[in-house]
């Protein structure tokens, strides 16, 4: 399981011209699910994301998490994060969880995230999404939980 997190000033997801999720300051989280991933591993990753201190505190250092910064979370499924890219010139998506399983796990992780944090927005699983963002910094991190 992999998450690409970006500290943003604002972000939104559109599907067919309609906004499905939108936040102001906060975290844009792209989430990739692998074949061996579980709800337990996903919950550990979500907990880490919500506690990860990448927002400026009063001293201007990365000392606050998204809650302390009064931010939001925009959670977007992205199977391409699971691609193997070491060989060849085309990504291999073999390590990604099959869509039917991934959708169920993604929905459970959205529900879990909402149980842990108030301001959670999402994209639509497997939709052709347009993601708009203003990256703050830029500050971007790749977090991973091994399968």
Curated annotation (Swiss-Prot):
<dbReference type="InterPro" id="IPR023509">
    <property type="entry name" value="DTD-like_sf"/>
</dbReference>
<dbReference type="Pfam" id="PF02580">
    <property type="entry name" value="Tyr_Deacylase"/>
</dbReference>
<dbReference type="GO" id="GO:0051500">
    <property type="term" value="F:D-tyrosyl-tRNA(Tyr) deacylase activity"/>
</dbReference>
<dbReference type="GO" id="GO:0106026">
    <property type="term" value="F:Gly-tRNA(Ala) deacylase activity"/>
</dbReference>
<comment type="function">
    <text>An aminoacyl-tRNA editing enzyme that deacylates mischarged D-aminoacyl-tRNAs. Also deacylates mischarged glycyl-tRNA(Ala), protecting cells against glycine mischarging by AlaRS. Acts via tRNA-based rather than protein-based catalysis; rejects L-amino acids rather than detecting D-amino acids in the active site. By recycling D-aminoacyl-tRNA to D-amino acids and free tRNA molecules, this enzyme counteracts the toxicity associated with the formation of D-aminoacyl-tRNA entities in vivo and helps enforce protein L-homochirality.</text>
</comment>
<dbReference type="GO" id="GO:0000049">
    <property type="term" value="F:tRNA binding"/>
</dbReference>
<keyword id="KW-0963">Cytoplasm</keyword>
<dbReference type="InterPro" id="IPR003732">
    <property type="entry name" value="Daa-tRNA_deacyls_DTD"/>
</dbReference>
<dbReference type="GO" id="GO:0019478">
    <property type="term" value="P:D-amino acid catabolic process"/>
</dbReference>
<dbReference type="GO" id="GO:0005737">
    <property type="term" value="C:cytoplasm"/>
</dbReference>
<comment type="similarity">
    <text>Belongs to the DTD family.</text>
</comment>
<feature type="short sequence motif" description="Gly-cisPro motif, important for rejection of L-amino acids">
    <location>
        <begin position="137"/>
        <end position="138"/>
    </location>
</feature>
<protein>
    <recommendedName>
        <fullName>D-aminoacyl-tRNA deacylase</fullName>
        <ecNumber>3.1.1.96</ecNumber>
    </recommendedName>
</protein>
<comment type="subunit">
    <text>Homodimer.</text>
</comment>
<keyword id="KW-0378">Hydrolase</keyword>
<dbReference type="GO" id="GO:0043908">
    <property type="term" value="F:Ser(Gly)-tRNA(Ala) hydrolase activity"/>
</dbReference>
<keyword id="KW-0820">tRNA-binding</keyword>
<keyword id="KW-0694">RNA-binding</keyword>
């Amino acid at each position: 399981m992999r998450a690409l997190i970006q500290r943003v000033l604002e972000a939104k997801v559109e599907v067919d011209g309609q906004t499905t999720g939108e936040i102001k300051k906060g975290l844009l989280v792209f989430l990739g699910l692998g074949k061996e991933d579980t709800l337990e591993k996903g919950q550990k990753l979500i907990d880490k994301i919500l506690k990860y201190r990448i927002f400026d505190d009063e001293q201007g250092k990365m000392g606050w998490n998204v809650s302390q910064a009064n931010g939001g979370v925009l959670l977007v499924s992205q199977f391409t994060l699971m691609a193997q890219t070491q060989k060849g010139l085309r990504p291999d998506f073999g390590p990604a969880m099959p869509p039917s399983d991934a959708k169920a796990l993604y929905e459970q992780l959205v529900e879990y995230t909402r149980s842990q944090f108030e301001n959670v927005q999402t994209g639509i699983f497997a939709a052709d999404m347009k993601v708009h963002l203003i990256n703050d910094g830029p500050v971007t991190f790749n977090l991973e939980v091994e399968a």
